[in-house]
């Protein structure tokens, strides 16, 4: 297996300061397309800015199997989690966006309790499901309107994040309820 970390030669130093430059290390980012019944997941690489559909988790009234979700974050070495924020088209909050925000706070709190160095943020996910369904139809990945596309939506969310990472909102774990 090839490590995707770019390692610089130890002789690579800044000629002005004589200090070795740090190696460029990609971070794995987990995008979550939050939903009350299911949640799509995609993994992204911060260096290549690519994403791939990962899984769809069953939700119990908006709550995941926390042990499973935290296990995925640990095992994959995720550095950041981007939770989709389903705003209304005019940018106002919806009932689902309030639940997604609450979920993100709870996730940040649980990550903090586990002493994991993971940042949780929210990112606007308007129209990701529409785009995901269109892509899935065009590629023959789904056969009918009821086939799940949540993981594809999470990929599109990741692309949105990569296009403008500064538009995401970091979540403070202290405010978890």
UniProtKB/Swiss-Prot annotation:
Q: Which UniProt keywords apply?
A: Cytoplasm, Hydrolase, Nuclease, Ribosome biogenesis
Instruction: State the source organism's domain of life.
Output: Bacteria
Q: Name one GO cellular component term.
A: cytosol
Broad EC category: hydrolase
- Matching CDD domains: YqgF (cd16964)
Is Hydrolase tagged as a keyword? yes
Question: What are the recorded Gene Ontology BP terms?
Answer: rRNA 5'-end processing
What is a single molecular function from GO for this protein?
Answer: nuclease activity
Q: What is its EC number?
A: 3.1.-.-
Location comes to: Cytoplasm
List, alphabetically, the PANTHER family matched: POLYNUCLEOTIDYL TRANSFERASE, RIBONUCLEASE H-LIKE SUPERFAMILY PROTEIN
Q: Which HAMAP family match?
A: Nuclease_YqgF (MF_00651)
What the protein does comes down to: Could be a nuclease involved in processing of the 5'-end of pre-16S rRNA.
Family according to the record:
Belongs to the YqgF nuclease family.
The protein, known as = Putative pre-16S rRNA nuclease
This protein's species is Psychrobacter arcticus (strain DSM 17307 / VKM B-2377 / 273-4)
């Amino acid at each position: 297996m090839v490590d995707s970390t770019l390692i610089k030669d130890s002789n690579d130093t800044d000629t002005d300061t004589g200090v070795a430059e740090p190696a460029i290390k990609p971070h794995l980012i987990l995008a979550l397309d939050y939903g009350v019944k299911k949640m799509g997941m995609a993994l992204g690489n911060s260096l290549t800015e690519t994403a791939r559909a990962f899984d769809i988790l069953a939700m119990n009234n908006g709550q995941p199997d926390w042990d499973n979700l935290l296990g995925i974050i640990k095992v994959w070495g995720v550095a950041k989690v981007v939770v989709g924020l389903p705003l209304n088209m005019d940018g106002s909050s919806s009932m689902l966006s309030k639940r997604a925000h609450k979920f993100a706070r709870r996730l940040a709190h649980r990550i903090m309790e586990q002493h994991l160095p993971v940042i949780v943020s929210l990112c606007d996910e308007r129209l990701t499901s529409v785009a995901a369904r269109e892509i899935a139809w065009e590629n023959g990945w789904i056969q009918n309107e009821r086939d799940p596309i949540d993981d594809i939506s999470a990929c599109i969310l990741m692309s949105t994040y990569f296009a403008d990472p500064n538009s995401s909102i970091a979540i403070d774990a202290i405010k978890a309820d």
